[in-house]
């Protein structure tokens, strides 16, 4: 007998920051848990999350998520005052925090959020050590992408 498949999507991705690859040179990838309130979890399950302008701020040996917009649900947040842009603490090990502090203070890196997803029943945030691109870097990347598309087109017609 075949099992019935659920009608829910199997993707664990909640939100993506597609602009990050265009705006920054992404280096090392990290994963962190996010400390959330109950109404935020319900809103995330409903898909009311935006992380396009999101970055991580390190303060007093802790990491905080800034700029993530989690819009409250009307039904889930009737008795609580909800701030969609509040600081959300990231759950990282001490070794990871020390490495991030060193990279951001000494080497001039930024910490940019690239994805938010479910891992089992926990919300995880994927972020990268990143350096900002200048305008000429973006133009070079555009030329490289155009050239690779043109090469593929030529190889397709040649075959």
UniProtKB/Swiss-Prot annotation:
Disordered, as annotated region: 138-159
One example of a Gene Ontology biological process annotation: trans-translation
Signal peptide: none
Keyword 4Fe-4S found: no
Gene Ontology molecular-function annotations: RNA binding
GO cellular component: cytosol
Origin: domain of life: Bacteria
Keyword Acetylation (UniProt): no
SUPFAM superfamilies: Small protein B (SmpB)
Localization of this protein: Cytoplasm
Gene3D superfamilies associated with the record: 2.40.280.10
Pfam (any one): SmpB
Positions with biased composition (Basic and acidic residues): 138-153
Keywords on record: Cytoplasm, RNA-binding
NCBIfam families: PRK05422.1, smpB
Family assignment from sequence similarity: Belongs to the SmpB family.
Function of the protein: Required for rescue of stalled ribosomes mediated by trans-translation. Binds to transfer-messenger RNA (tmRNA), required for stable association of tmRNA with ribosomes. tmRNA and SmpB together mimic tRNA shape, replacing the anticodon stem-loop with SmpB. tmRNA is encoded by the ssrA gene; the 2 termini fold to resemble tRNA(Ala) and it encodes a 'tag peptide', a short internal open reading frame. During trans-translation Ala-aminoacylated tmRNA acts like a tRNA, entering the A-site of stalled ribosomes, displacing the stalled mRNA.
Official protein name in the record: SsrA-binding protein
UniProt organism field: Pseudoalteromonas translucida (strain TAC 125)
Taxon lineage: Bacteria, Pseudomonadati, Pseudomonadota, Gammaproteobacteria, Alteromonadales
Gene this protein is translated from: smpB
């Amino acid at each position: 007998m075949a099992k019935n498949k659920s009608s829910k999507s199997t993707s664990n991705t909640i939100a993506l920051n597609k602009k990050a690859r265009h705006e920054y040179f992404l280096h090392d990838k990290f994963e962190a848990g996010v400390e959330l309130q109950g109404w935020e979890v319900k809103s995330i399950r409903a898909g009311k999350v935006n992380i396009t302008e999101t970055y991580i701020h390190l303060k007093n040996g802790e990491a905080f998520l800034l700029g993530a917009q989690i819009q409250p649900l009307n039904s889930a947040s009737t008795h609580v005052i909800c701030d969609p842009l509040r600081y959300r603490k990231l759950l990282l090990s001490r070794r990871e925090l020390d490495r991030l502090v060193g990279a951001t203070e000494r080497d001039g890196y930024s910490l940019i959020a690239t994805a938010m997803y479910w891992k089992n029943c926990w919300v995880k945030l994927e972020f990268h050590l990143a350096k900002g691109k200048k305008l000429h870097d973006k133009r070079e990347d555009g030329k490289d992408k155009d050239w690779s598309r043109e090469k593929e087109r030529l190889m397709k017609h040649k075959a």
